[in-house]
């Protein structure tokens, strides 16, 4: 299980605003090239995002669905990442003085990713998630009033 955390220098409400805006995900989610559609009720439980992911010229269209939403503090997604299967991606926001401690927990649930889970997979997820949290921090603080 790949768990990382980052202190973001803005209040939890600002970080939540970024998580709650499906249109921003291409700005900070590593590998996401473009958001194709965000359900109007995002991030309500059951709402989805359709997006294009890829590396270089190789791209795929994938989706994610909200599984748990506690506005302002917790968002859990199930992301489909073909051909690898699905993954659980959980964000927890904790107030930390005037800032936000974001805990990101990601692990494969189904498919090839779940079957090959081990140290190499964990390393890739840790590197990806470190970069993703840094992007989230930049997005949240850049847009802060």
Predicted segments, located by residue:
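Beta-strand/loop substructures that line and gate deep hydrophobic ligand-binding cavities in soluble
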Residues: 78-131
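A generic structural motif
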Residues: 30, 71-72, 84, 99
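Glycine-rich portal/gate segments that line the openings of hydrophobic small-molecule binding cavities
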Residues: 36-81, 96, 134-145
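Hydrophobic ligand-binding cavity/cleft-lining segments
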Residues: 1-41, 145
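Short, surface-exposed coil-to-beta transition loops
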Residues: 2-3, 59-63, 85-90
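Short, solvent-exposed helix-to-loop capping segments enriched in aromatics
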Residues: 17-30, 46-58, 124
